[in-house]
């Protein structure tokens, strides 16, 4: 970790009067200090609201079953579960109740509970079971002896609800069996804390932005002074993961004549804000996201909030690579020395990543036989190296006349990079070829499924198809992630790593799409309309590609959206979202100045420190503590929000002290 030191420009300004310096400090603290105070106050209000007695989690009051039921039939409910009581009035017929989630695509039914036959007419037998409330459930009741379906129903149970399913004969001329579902006690609204947290957070951001806007209008001169003084901070900020920077230890080289300093790119707050949004969401979901299913990774196909953050981080890393590299080359750095710096940074990212994903300091000596090799930072390191080297090899000066060209149909930002695009298309062709043509022993060629009980249990050990096979072949099962998200619904038993080798190809593609966004920002600087037109075009084109690949379906498309595979449709979909976010952030943050990016801007400026720190200190106080009710979404959500807010606070303090971790 390095602290920023005073530059020559700062020393020259040191001779200003004490009154001017005091005015600058007052201006800085009046905006940022009040923003921070508002943030802390909002966090306190949120914690109090969510933990207040009689809040939204009425589990203790509503989970109790009716008094006339035998205690042995009661299930100890956990988070995201409901109690289902099955009453069987059928004489001479034992029942087997099967269950599966409606989100489990082509899955085998799993035995839920067996219900004995009724001992005599009018006296039903009963059995109790807990059912998942995360998604809709499909229940099928079979005659145990004949294995014949008796009835079938689909229902979305509510958390901590109490339900009864009565199976009985109906005599309407023809003997029929009916299955009637009744609600004994209503479920709780476990999503209410999320709604409260979102509204409070949105209100805090709006209030802070409004206050800062008022401050800038009331004291314009102080605002200018603050902007000038903060420029030195921007010059000293490291380009972690390729973030654009004003200084570099390599700037002592002789400047080539082909690079013009007049094209030096400005630092864009929207880029740092976008990085901060992705990072803070990543911290929140990694800490648990309140244990809500939509803040966890999808079991296989589809998208949740947790599936958005990593590709966005990769995308904005690509944008920063181009902006940073252009700045460094324009200041005269030789390509050879820059290549060495790229290689060293990539090596450090991979090493730090391996250390983070193998936290063995509390479990005794680390066994090399069990070391996990892939991981988030490892993939970032490889992706950064490939994309940065690709841009370095074919780097060209930004043409001056492009910035003044008035045609909105100009494709100079694309045509100037045709060698890079050609190599990216080759890489994508390699991914498609390996995914759909590589023979995998015991599995169908081109298989994209989760294995386990998916596809009706035909391919239990084929998780991930070619992607899983390549990882197991080259790295070995013991060096992969042992608890993939597919195990939740599909009960997979083989190791599978979502940050595996084959998926890295598509992360490179996504980072290069981020490079394209960076080129748009630089090639058409000061031409907001042209930038927004191109962002819109890329958003629509990538979105249409996603529509074609997925057939607007979660599971039935040619290439489903899948985070575990980092499928092509996953890349195009998330890149489309990323261009849309930049389409919103760039005019709001950089052009109009309606929002400063607070509070996401601060962690976006110190991304490596925040990411590594939140991983290392995850299980330490004050980021985690023992909860009064471990089965309460409300308490988990409060803990995770507080922990995330603390990292925002840490990033803010480090920014104020001009401390940034660079690698």
From Swiss-Prot:
Effect caused by changing residue 237 to A: Displayed both lysosomal and plasma membrane localization, reduced intralysosomal proteolytic cleavage and enzymatic activity
GO cellular component: lysosomal lumen; lysosomal membrane; plasma membrane; specific granule membrane; tertiary granule membrane
Effect of residue 599 to L: In MPS3C; results in a negligible amount of protein synthesis; very low enzyme activity
Entry-annotated residues carrying Phosphoserine: 243, 245
Keywords: Acyltransferase, Disease variant, Disulfide bond, Glycoprotein, Lysosome, Membrane, Mucopolysaccharidosis, Phosphoprotein, Retinitis pigmentosa, Transferase, Transmembrane, Transmembrane helix
Phenotype upon changing residue 372 to H: In MPS3C; retained in the endoplasmic reticulum; loss of enzymatic activity
Broadest EC class assigned to this enzyme: transferase
Annotated membrane topology: Multi-pass membrane protein
Xref: InterPro entries: HGSNAT_cat
Name of one Pfam family that matches: HGSNAT_cat
Consequence when changing residue 333 to S: No loss of intralysosomal proteolytic cleavage and enzymatic activity
UniProt entry tagged with the keyword NAD: no
Cytoplasmic side: 212-275, 324-345, 396-420, 522-529, 586-592, 656-663
Recorded consequence of changing residue 311 to L: In MPS3C; results in a negligible amount of protein synthesis; very low enzyme activity; retained in the endoplasmic reticulum
Disease implication from the record: Mucopolysaccharidosis 3C: A form of mucopolysaccharidosis type 3, an autosomal recessive lysosomal storage disease due to impaired degradation of heparan sulfate. MPS3 is characterized by severe central nervous system degeneration, but only mild somatic disease. Onset of clinical features usually occurs between 2 and 6 years; severe neurologic degeneration occurs in most patients between 6 and 10 years of age, and death occurs typically during the second or third decade of life. Retinitis pigmentosa 73: A retinal dystrophy belonging to the group of pigmentary retinopathies. Retinitis pigmentosa is characterized by retinal pigment deposits visible on fundus examination and primary loss of rod photoreceptor cells followed by secondary loss of cone photoreceptors. Patients typically have night vision blindness and loss of midperipheral visual field. As their condition progresses, they lose their far peripheral visual field and eventually central vision as well.
Note: A signal sequence is predicted but has been shown not to be cleaved in the endoplasmic reticulum.
Function: Lysosomal acetyltransferase that acetylates the non-reducing terminal alpha-glucosamine residue of intralysosomal heparin or heparan sulfate, converting it into a substrate for luminal alpha-N-acetyl glucosaminidase.
Record's protein name: Heparan-alpha-glucosaminide N-acetyltransferase
Organism encoding this protein: Homo sapiens (Human)
Gene name for this UniProt entry: HGSNAT
